[in-house]
Amino acid sequence: MASVQEQLDAIRSKSGARRTVGLDNTTVCQFVTNDPTLADAVNAATEEFEALNQEFPELMALGEVEQVAAIEKHLVNFYADDTVNPYVSMAARGPWIVTTKGAVLHDNGGYGMLGFGHVPEPIIEAMTKPQVMANVMTPSLSQFRLSAALEREIGQTREDGCPFTHFLAMNSGSESVSVATRMSDVNAKMLTDEGGRHAGKPVKKMSLAGGFHGRTGRPAQFSDACLTAYKTHLATFRNEHLITVEPNDVDGLKAAYARADAEGYFIEAFFMEPVMGEGNPGLAITPDFYSTARALTKEHGTILLIDSIQAGLRTTGYLALVDSPGFRDLEAPDLEAYSKALNAGQYPLSILALTPESAALYRQGIYGNTMTANPRAMDIGSAVLGMVTPEVRQNIVDRGHEFVTKLEALADELGGAITKVEGTGLLFSCELDPKFKAYGTDSTEEFMRLQGIGVIHGGDNSLRFTPHFQVTSQEVDLIIDHVRNAVLNGPQAG
């Protein structure tokens, strides 16, 4: 078989004009010697390139810009047009992507779902296993297997073990939060109906400032990070009033509940991320803030949801907040949601974990889903948890610390271009000075993508990174070097 470089040269020589340069040849050759998944990605790209040229010869002959436009012509993109990746992905293995024009990228921008990279073999094996496809209405050993795996995973560091007794399995993470809102709705009705503890009181919602809990229905109403767009365009948000509290502001949280008592309304639910994924990527909630929230929510009858959809596994190496350092002796929340790392970015799966008290709130008929707890999704969740070894957990923590330390050193080196670094495990970000445009046309994000580093913006003006769980120090240095290059040689705002 031809070498990696020869294969890439062959793809580049036969395709139209490319805009995405990707990693330089020297870098590719250096990583090929240490990471077999890069060679696997290029080998797969060569096969796919030949097949695509047979299937879509005219499309493959187009330049990269025209090719992207042709492919997306009939698709409605949820996000701004100028934040779409500037390339067409053709093959990938591990953290490596190869484009239709032969560029190689290191992917750190998979919205936190690609903890084990692209095409992880145990996950693909679980996903392709022949199944009796049905939902929770048909008992399956796959359901039993994942329930047992979740019980082993959650609470493994605690003397009292797993605090959750029941699990709901849904599709997207946002959907698991939707189910949580139904349960908090049941609780709110019970408490505000005639004879209830908060009878007749108006009902309000609370989350963290900059919090994100999904795009569907009521989860969107709890998502402060997106409220500006919703209120601008949606009639149903015209009269929405979400109470927000700054992360880790204990006094502000106490004041919010004191105001609810004074003004006579009931806070139905308090939703918070243990590590913020959108508003301030990488910022962790402190044990003191959490314990205050747990005490106040219990005192007032509010449902407390911890949204670990993006933070689970990625931030501390553990799926659940209750296993995170500083939280192991604290009382569990009523509900906790997991999704991205748990489904490996390969098949829709989210889990809502329930304590005995919160499980008792569910009422048959208030929610339903065609694919809930289907065996294929269950097996994927089990496979993921089976891949989380002690070494993987430790690497998440160690490399996360290395990333933050090296980004902070880079911030000092660059003298103000990077204004803030936040990070917990492998969810971290660096905020840029306003003279830099973080995303969109002629931005730092776009420049890094064109040069071979996949990244997605977050916060007001930050670059957000979510690398794979087995990332190495060599990869850390690659990313740091590309951030430096983007700041020094990339575009600036204006």
What are these regions (language model features)?
Residues 215-219, 327-361, 373-378:
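Active-site PLP attachment segment
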Residues 2-3, 10, 14, 390, ...:
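PLP-dependent enzyme catalytic core of the Aspartate aminotransferase-like
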Residues 1-21, 114-117, 151-272, 276, ...:
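PLP-dependent aspartate aminotransferase-fold enzymes
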Residues 1-164:
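N-terminal glycine-rich, Lys/His-bearing helix-loop that initiates the first secondary-structure elements
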Residues 373-395, 399:
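Structural motif of enzymes handling amino- and sulfur-group chemistry
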